[in-house]
Amino acid sequence: MAPKPNSDVTTKRWWEEYHRCRGVLVKQLRTEKGWTEAELAKRATVSIQWLRALEGNRLKSNHRMQHEMQVISALGFGTYEIKDFIGRVEDMVKETLGPPPWLKPAQADTSERPSK
């Protein structure tokens, strides 16, 4: 039995995929620029270990959002362009899982009803 569209399980799975895709996109953008992990870490003023954890989806829940923003900024996304980065991550997740479960309409009862 598949989880309901708006269940805690599907919401958790969506966010797990979001965080995975975020790391994939950071790594993709870094390699497109021809930068090593060390170079991006230096530009973003974060440790190489932290950057590796971001790219490998191994950040703990207490990671600092400031570090994440420093990395995104170092990749060329300004304050007003961060939504573009987030949009790209969301598009990657939608390709895998579809839209966020909290945006999916409730599953309608599709059983056929007898006609009168």
Segments and roles (model prediction):
Residues S47, R58-L59, V89:
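The DNA-recognition helices of helix-turn-helix-type DNA-binding domains
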Residues K33-L54:
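Short alpha-helical DNA-recognition segment
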Residues K27, A38, M69:
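Residues within the helices of the helix-turn-helix
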Residues M69-V89:
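Intrinsically disordered, low-complexity basic tails/linkers immediately adjacent to helix-turn-helix/homeobox/MYB/SANT
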Residues G34, K42, N57-S73:
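Short, basic-rich loop-to-helix N-cap that marks the start of a DNA-contacting helix
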Residues A2-E32:
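A short, Lys/Arg-rich alpha-helix, primarily the initiator
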Residues S7, K83-K116:
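Short, charged recognition helix plus adjacent turn
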